[in-house]
Amino acid sequence: MTARSISVSRNGSRSIEPLWPPVLAMLAVGGLYAALPPSLVGGAPRWLPIAIVVGLLTAIVVFHYRGDHFVHQVLGHILNGLVTAAMIFSLALLIKEVTEHNITPRRLLTSAASLWISNFLIFASWYWRLDGGGPHARARTPGHTDGAFLFPQMTLPADVKLAAGEQDWEPRFMDYLFLAFNTSTAFSPTDVPVLSRWAKFLMMIQAVISLTVLALLAGRAVNIL
């Protein structure tokens, strides 16, 4: 096994991937939501969204290092659900302001950019937490051969994987972030076929949100021209 392969503990189980990439992604989502105009957050205080995100992330990290993977996963789903609902709520308010012509071009651009970036960060977290039973379940299985997404590494012959030192390859958060980014830009996965129905459903929602945000910007640009 190469130096960059997943480490193996004394009892034979592999250590889970670092937690900081998904944590940073959720902190970015909280910051982007807090930066939205008050009219797009229902009049809530600016500190409230980031406080909720930080509070839940703190608990998630604590339970992660305690080894309580069930609570860690449940809290992760709660956090994902909250930020997803908040994003859709803000998008609905943005649509309302655009249709009523109550928003300036600059505020529309910054708000749409915040929601668009939040969209692929949030859904990257969903894919990371749900695929193959979540990060802890994936870490207990040598190699990643059964999941909702068919990553290119999963299709390599065993001898090719062994020669490349990728026999124990498993997707990390960056792989799901790349998948979510492509879904937001191309409205479909590019190099990763989708196998599970739940994944197809989530990707449809993500693509619709991304398309709605871009349609708002395009419609406003046409009106300005």
Regions found by a protein language model. Name each.
Residues 21, 43-57:
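Structural signature of hydrophobic alpha-helical transmembrane segments
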Residues 10-25:
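N-terminal membrane topogenic signal
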Residues 170-225:
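Pore domain of cation channels
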Residues 132-191:
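Membrane-proximal soluble regions of multi-pass membrane proteins
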Residues 98-136:
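Pore-domain transmembrane helices of cation channels
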Residues 33-46, 65-69:
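Short, hydrophobic transmembrane alpha-helix segments
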Residues 26-40, 61, 92-93:
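Membrane-embedded alpha-helical segments in integral membrane proteins
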